Amino acid sequence: LYSSAASDVYKRQPIARRIVEVRATEPIATSGQLVSLVDSVIPKAHRATGNPAKRVFQALRIEVNGELDKLSRTLPKIALHLREHGRLVVESYHSLEDTAVKRFMNQGLTVDVPANMPVIPDDAQPFFKALTRGAMKASKEEIVHNTRSSSVRLRAVELCRPIPERWIPRLEDEAAGRKAIKGGR
């Protein structure tokens, strides 16, 4: 619960301490035991948005499966294989994924020079063009037909010119897991 996968878990430190305390005396063998443990830490007044253990289970799943690491390696691999005018469209199902996607896409959407530079060299121009304005959310009609779509965020970019040569080693490093997406994990 101290990993970045748990960064949006309410009261994650008290929950982690309580898990350690309980495990010192007995193993946590069932999901029901973990739910009870989380319920004992989080006051009833803070449970308006549903079961608080839901985010704990999500954080554990994300960390155990290495989901953010896989995402951070997959996005640059895709970018390196895009042809000019190729599109990268990503659906994110929770805020941590969306943040990683947003930060990755922003690398190619921004001018890569100091703010006071009078002339911007060609290789510092953005190589992605945004196809969505921020993250698109499901419409109310879609949510009525598919309740799971309420958490989905969609972002899309198009490769508007070849990736500059100086970016390729950086993307290759990210794809190999040698360097995380800036601000990602």
Language-model features, listed with the residues they occupy:
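Short, charged, surface-exposed loops that flank catalytic or proteolytic processing sites
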Residues: 26-34
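C-terminal catalytic and target-recognition region of SAM-dependent MTase-like enzymes
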Residues: 30-31, 39-80, 87-185
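P-loop NTPase catalytic cores that bind/hydrolyze ATP
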Residues: 14-16
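Short, well-ordered alpha-helical segments in soluble proteins
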Residues: 7, 23-26, 38, 42
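Helix-to-beta-strand junctions that scaffold the AdoMet/dcAdoMet cofactor pocket
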Residues: 24, 82-83
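Single conserved hydrophobic/aromatic residue that forms the stacking wall/gate
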Residues: 1-6, 10
